[in-house]
């Protein structure tokens, strides 16, 4: 990058997406500072790497910065953003900074409504196993290294794209993976057609020598296939896909499947992370590995031994015979897939879910879908909505979600007002042998930790 932009300031530096970029820039030798509303293990890590972190937002904090980076979660009237504009300091979205980093290497970008983080981690594992030493920027912490960013010395960078505000159109990846398209981020996109159009534009940005890797099992994505202008590889369970998973079978807490590449069976994989939905994510990583010339044996080893990502069907611990699991899923499609994965991984156990809806806008737009997403759990505890900076919407709250789920026939639904009430209620109902699953993109994971520690807050 042009070194006249040497000091980079991040507003909301503790976010999982922002912190990864900040860590890469620190490792590249840039001066990095930023602010967040609270201290966390993420901000502590950045401080340890040489970053300067402020807690709370104040226009004085940006002093000396050459550029200010913001995420879509930062309000336009944020005092640091206002101070930067008044001082003539460029204010750019997170995606624009990531796009600059991607220009340094051959980029492999993973996009899609669901499964991005898991797929990105799998692609990174495959390249790492193949000796390619990739740089990685991911939307979750890799369990193997405890961070969401790695500065490698190889020629490739693997990154997760955020389509929520259309900013992924700033990328021109050498390899673009699209896992699926769904009704998501309807606070930005008017409808599914607009979302599909945006993904097609993303694929159009692939250079002439690049390739698209797309899932043929997803109907909206399948509809785009005839419109893709660049070379592409399809994957999925469909017999029409270039790369197929066949004979999918749960075995010893894993998922075994056969991999078929253009009618040639390459072998089997015992996937190291649970859930049938992860088979498709793994196929995307297989496709990328094959495209880069890696042997199937190398790809197989990577996918069978990978540790996974924090907050993706993550087993947190066990207490009193209750296994506590946490997952980031917050969209109805993700919730259904996660519950299916839990049922497959822990057969014949009672599943107790604590769900924290995320954002008022998402809850309103997908309300009917949420009411039908929890049939595979035995007991459901619903929390108030995690606002994520949004203002409340009349008639949209956690209690209405619980009532809607109950109205659709679920007999084990309970609404609670907060963390302490949730933990107290769980103490009453949990039984030896249960699976306790915390679900949501907010701070619902804290409830699982409270249960494990025996604390009520």
UniProtKB/Swiss-Prot annotation:
Gene Ontology MF annotations: ATP binding; UDP-N-acetylmuramate-L-alanine ligase activity
Keywords on record: ATP-binding, Cell cycle, Cell division, Cell shape, Cell wall biogenesis/degradation, Cytoplasm, Ligase, Nucleotide-binding, Peptidoglycan synthesis
SUPFAM superfamilies: MurCD N-terminal domain (SSF51984), MurD-like peptide ligases, catalytic domain (SSF53623), MurD-like peptide ligases, peptide-binding domain (SSF53244)
Origin superkingdom: Bacteria
EC number: 6.3.2.8
GO cellular component: cytoplasm
Cited InterPro entries: Mur-like_cat_sf, Mur_ligase_C, Mur_ligase_C_dom_sf, Mur_ligase_cen, Mur_ligase_N, MurCDEF_pg_biosynth, UDP-N-AcMur_Ala_ligase_MurC
Protein location: Cytoplasm
Binding residues annotated for ATP, in chain numbering: 112-118
Pathway: Cell wall biogenesis; peptidoglycan biosynthesis
Record field: catalytic activity: UDP-N-acetyl-alpha-D-muramate + L-alanine + ATP = UDP-N-acetyl-alpha-D-muramoyl-L-alanine + ADP + phosphate + H(+)
GO terms classed as biological process: cell division; cell wall organization; peptidoglycan biosynthetic process; regulation of cell shape
A Pfam family that the UniProt record links to this protein: Mur_ligase_C
Family: Belongs to the MurCDEF family.
Function: Cell wall formation.
Name of protein: UDP-N-acetylmuramate--L-alanine ligase
């Amino acid at each position: 990058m042009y070194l006249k932009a040497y000091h980079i300031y991040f507003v909301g530096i503790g976010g999982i997406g922002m912190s990864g970029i900040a860590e890469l820039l620190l490792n590249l030798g840039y001066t990095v500072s930023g602010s967040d509303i609270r201290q966390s293990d993420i901000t502590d890590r950045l401080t340890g790497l040489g970053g300067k972190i402020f807690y709370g937002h104040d226009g004085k904090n940006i002093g000396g910065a050459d550029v200010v980076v913001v995420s879509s979660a930062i309000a336009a009237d944020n005092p640091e953003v206002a101070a930067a504009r008044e001082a003539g300091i460029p204010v750019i979205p997170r995606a624009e900074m990531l796009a600059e980093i991607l220009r340094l290497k051959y980029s492999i970008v993973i996009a899609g409504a669901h499964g991005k983080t898991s797929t990105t981690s799998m692609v990174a594992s495959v390249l790492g196993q193949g000796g390619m030493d990739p740089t990685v920027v991911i939307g979750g912490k890799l369990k193997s290294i405890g961070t969401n960013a790695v500065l490698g010395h190889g020629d490739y960078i693997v990154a997760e794209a955020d389509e929520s505000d259309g900013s992924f159109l700033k990328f021109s990846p050498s390899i673009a993976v699209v896992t699926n398209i769904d009704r998501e981020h309807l606070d930005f996109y008017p409808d599914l057609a607009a979302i599909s159009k945006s993904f097609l534009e993303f694929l159009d940005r692939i250079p002439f020598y690049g390739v698209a890797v797309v899932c043929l099992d997803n109907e909206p994505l399948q509809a785009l296939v005839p419109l893709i202008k660049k070379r592409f590889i399809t994957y999925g369970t469909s017999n029409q896909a270039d790369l197929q998973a066949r004979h999918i079978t749960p075995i010893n807490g894993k998922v075994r499947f056969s991999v078929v590449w253009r009618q040639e069976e390459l072998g089997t994989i015992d996937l190291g992370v649970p859930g049938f939905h992860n088979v498709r994510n793994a196929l995307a990583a297989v496709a990328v590995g094959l495209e880069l010339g890696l042997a199937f044996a190398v790809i197989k080893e990577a996918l069978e031994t990978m540790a996974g990502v924090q907050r993706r069907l993550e087993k947190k611990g066990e207490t009193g015979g209750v296994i506590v699991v946490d997952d980031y899923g917050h969209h109805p499609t993700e919730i259904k897939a996660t519950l299916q994965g839990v049922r497959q991984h822990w057969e014949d156990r009672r599943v107790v879910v604590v769900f924290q809806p995320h954002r008022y806008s998402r809850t309103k737009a997908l309300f009917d879908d949420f009411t039908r997403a929890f049939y595979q759990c035995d007991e459901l505890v619903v929390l108030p909505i995690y606002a994520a900076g949004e203002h409340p919407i009349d008639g949209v709250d956690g209690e209405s979600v619980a009532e809607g789920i109950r109205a659709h026939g679920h007999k084990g639904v309970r609404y609670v007002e907060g963390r302490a009430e949730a933990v107290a209620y769980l103490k009453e109902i949990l039984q030896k042998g249960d699976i306790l699953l915390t679900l949501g993109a907010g701070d619902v994971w804290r409830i699982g930790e409270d249960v494990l520690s025996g604390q009520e807050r």
